[in-house]
Amino acid sequence: MMSYPLYKLFLKGKLCDVEIVAEGKSIRAHRLVLSAYSKYFYNLFNGNFLEKNVDVIDLEADYKTVFDVIYYMYTESIELHKGNTESIFSLVHYLQIKPLIKKCIYEFNSIVNEENCIRLFKFAELYDLSELKRRARWLMPSLVMNEKDRLREMSLDDLSLMLVQIRNTVDRSIALSAITEWIQTNVRERRRHAVHLATCLGDVPGTASSRAVYKHYMSELRIRVTEFQPAYHNCVVYLGGSMKGRVTALDPETGKSVVLSTWWPEERWECFTAVCMNDVLYFAGGKLDAVPTRQVLSYDVKANTWSRQPNLSEFRSDAAAYAIGGCIYIIGGYDANDRPTNTTLYWRPGYDRWYRGPTLVEAVAETSAVCYKNEIWVLGGRIHRDGVPDVTDVVQKLSGGTWTKVNELSVPKASVTAIVYKERLYCVGGLVDRYAPTNEVIRYRDDTNEWEYVGSTKIERGGAVGCVYNDELYVFGGTDTFTSERYNGVIWKRANDVSCHFATMNAAYATYLEL
């Protein structure tokens, strides 16, 4: 912070040697202070400009914005919010005040939402703010799904821009919904724009009329009724009972549940990792009464028996896990010092210890693991960036004995629910901006190696338990919710409420049990 005496001189207008004017109002300041923070003022006062010795400088900005920026140069303090960040950024970009530029960019990333994503995307294009563009683009499909009134009121130019931005990253039905919903608000007036909107979508309507294009899109959106599929599961097994640690069998269709067993430790066990293999649930690592532990327990669902397994070779909490090829992999997580680790451990029944596997590309915890195309993938998670906890958008996969990076998620997020459903990889919900749950659902496209937005769950949730049950994708619980939802490939619907064990990396699987 600039020394207090200089700030006092500024407030009193003492020893000032330059006058800044905005909207006809003047602010007296010191060239030295302005030059120390602004490259624009430094070059102006020290270069060969005609204004070098001018005592009055006019700025094309509102008075409040100019005063706030000058106040920042004396105090390094400024209040940014969604009502002033754009005007502040425009001015400091012109004045070349790098620390405040960075501060504004950080604020943009926290205030962008469905309401302002179109406007901020255009603002980001004007100043080439790549991260803001990415976040604003990510929210556009959510605007289509969750902000119908705002969509109907959108201008043709804004809708056209949005279609161009989302057409390659969302399921086609979402883009078609945006077009038809917008036209239906005033069919007589808006239907004539259907050919133009089809072009924005990447379609080639040729000589087709706007009426024909609109009719075709309405027809394409009709949902075909699928044939009835016989049930081959009758329950989902997961760890329920909130913090009570009860292995529970749930019938998702009726909401009825049966407690199969309660684990044996009396201590408070949390932050452990659960994984399923061959009707056996394994619980590894975590903390007992807040103390890191390496213990591993297993519960045989069919035999209703508990067993101790070899301890982990390292302390591990909030790790991801997946079982494949008869092996269990424990991936990432926090070490004994609560720092994300980049190590992988593996074990199979019959081994007397855990072995070290390939090293992750990025140390990560609170990530989600899934098997996709016979490879283990981990999506997002929490990292330490320059020693500061943060979330990541990095996706990694274990291929040929080596972890490699895959195209990143739409935005950084942790505690997502990763599920393969109908041979497609889905990423449901998660926690963004540290601990804010989201209801975004994205799907990986193998043809473009990109993630596409395919809808939103009814409830925002992070850290939910998920599995496929009788040809539908289910998610249970999550951050601050006991709700569950199911997805048939077209729409999400609320299902029966459940009580999942939180403060852990839980797991669930569908099976058939004689209850």
UniProtKB/Swiss-Prot annotation:
Domain BTB as annotated: residue spans: 16-82
Domain of life per record: Viruses
InterPro entries linked to this entry: BTB/POZ_dom, Kelch-typ_b-propeller, Kelch_1, SKP1/BTB/POZ_sf, Vaccinia_A55R
Alphabetized SUPFAM superfamilies for the sequence: Kelch motif, POZ domain
Keywords of this entry: Kelch repeat, Repeat
Kelch repeat locations: 280-326, 328-374, 376-423, 424-471, 473-512
One Pfam entry name: BTB
Family: Belongs to the poxviruses Kelch family.
Protein name as catalogued: Kelch repeat protein M-T8
Organism: Myxoma virus (strain Lausanne) (MYXV)
